[in-house]
Regions:
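N-terminal acidic, proline/glycine-rich, low-complexity intrinsically disordered segments
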Residues: 1-20
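Transmembrane-helix bundle of Major Facilitator Superfamily
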Residues: 15, 19-23, 27-222, 346-382
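Helix-boundary and loop/linker segments of multi-pass membrane transporters
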Residues: 38-46, 232-234, 260, 295-302
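12-transmembrane solute porter fold
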Residues: 49-58, 62, 67-69, 238-240, ...
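Hydrophobic/aromatic residues in alpha-helical transmembrane segments
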Residues: 67, 91, 104, 142, ...
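Hydrophobic alpha-helical interface/terminus motif in multipass membrane transporters
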Residues: 71-74, 158, 162, 196, ...
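A membrane-interface helix-boundary motif in multi-pass transporters
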Residues: 198-210, 256-267, 335
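C-terminal membrane-cytosol helix-exit motif in multi-pass small-molecule transporters
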Residues: 210-229, 244-256, 273-288
Length: 382
């Protein structure tokens, strides 16, 4: 009888939904999805965590969309064209985020989520202040890279914080509400950025993050009780360096392909460096005890297909948001406020639908729901 119960428990453990950045097996510090606990404590903890995560995620997503709509004004302020250096205001953020994201998730597995989350809020808020006061385009780009570091820490562990706080049957709802926050940040950014840029200055699109970050940090320190620890395996510096090098090189190559020329030696060298680094990463990760990436996930067909679908859907739906502000303002003659309003419908629709999709996923599963959503997205693009 004991053996049967043990086998059942192992099946339940393997079937639990874990965050993408997993370290060793659950050592008891993360709540088991199927283990009941005191109801009052569960309710207080999970909703408090949701509020804290929502603040950080809203700040990070708001900043991404609010900067896009203000790029023409920033270029005009520093007297630079709309191509070339000004692109680094966006690319610096993306490059640092790409290089740090997975490493941040691994470190949080080792020392706990609270210190990484708090560090992310502090770095992002300080970076926002530096962006607002930047006297030159070069310093603005450097401050945006600092913001990217903070944003990577925030976005890397926000799903893990929610999946740890909520039981299995409520995770879809929690992640759906998190998607609402993401959509609200993206949808608020263009309109708010247009109003702020038109009435005040583009510098205030960064200052708006300061009160949000401070409030989030205060709540984090008062509500989250997790203490820093170092008991979940060793860090993999070689894997972290190769991962960062590979992702940064590929991101740079794809970002500047049109400007450098798709046949240029610089572009080919950049992409080749990225590919070689990722191949070496695969070789190294197979030989270390505590890899930065759990390669067994790549053999999980469900995880791999879901990840690829997510990447492709984001490319299809959100990649155009970078170019649309330039198209609407420079070619179509719309004001910054008008361009912001035209960019709002997509994320606003996501904000309305996401809570229902999360609940439906908890009840009926994700397979047909995701397929239906991607089908509707394809129809909309056509």
């Amino acid at each position: 009888m004991a053996q049967k119960e043990t086998g059942k428990q192992e099946i339940l453990t393997q079937g639990q939904v874990k965050p993408p950045f997993t370290g060793p097996e659950n050592d008891g510090s993360r709540p088991q999805a199927d283990t009941p606990g005191p109801k009052q404590t569960e309710q207080a903890n999970k909703w408090a965590v949701l509020v804290i995560v929502a603040i950080g995620v809203f700040m990070a997503t708001l900043d991404s969309s609010i900067v896009n709509i203000s790029l023409p004004a920033i270029a005009s302020s520093f007297g630079v064209p709309l191509s070339g250096e000004i692109e680094w205001v966006i690319i610096a953020y993306l490059v640092v985020t790409a290089g740090v994201l997975l490493t941040a998730g691994r470190i949080s597995d080792m020392i706990g989520r609270k210190p990484i989350w708090a560090a992310g809020l502090i770095i992002f808020t300080v970076g926002s202040a530096f962006c607002g006061f930047a006297p030159s385009l070069g310093l603005l780009i450097a401050a945006r890279a600092l913001q990217g570091l903070g944003g990577a820490l925030i976005m890397a562990i926000s799903p893990a914080m929610l999946t740890s706080a909520f039981p299995a049957h409520e995770r879809g709802r929690a992640l759906g509400l998190n998607a609402v926050v993401v959509a609200l940040g993206v949808s608020t950014g263009p309109t708010l950025g247009g109003i702020i840029t038109s009435t005040l200055s583009w510098r205030w699109i960064f200052f708006v993050n300061l009160p949000i970050g401070i409030i989030g940090l205060i709540l984090t320190m008062r509500i989250l009780k997790e203490k820093m620890r170092w008991n979940r395996g060793k860090f993999d510096p070689a894997g972290a360096i190769l991962l960062a090098l590979g992702l940064v090189a590929i991101t740079l190559g794809l970002s500047f392909g049109q400007e450098w020329g798709w046949n240029s030696p610089l572009l080919i060298g950049c992409l080749a460096t990225g590919v070689i680094a990722l191949i070496l990463l695969y070789i190294v990760e197979k030989r270390v005890a505590d890899p930065i990436i759990n390669l067994s996930l790549l053999h999980n067909r469900v995880f791999l297909s879901a990840t690829l679908s997510l990447v492709l859907s984001f490319l299809a739906l959100f990649a155009v948001s970078f170019m649309l502000p330039f198209y609407l303002e420079e070619l179509r003659g719309f004001t910054t406020v008008q361009a912001g309003l035209l960019l709002t419908p997509l994320p606003l629709t996501i904000a309305v639908i996401a809570p229902f999709s999360g609940t439906l996923a908890d009840r009926f599963g994700t397979r047909w729901l995701a397929a239906g959503g991607l089908t509707l997205a394809c129809i909309g693009l056509i």
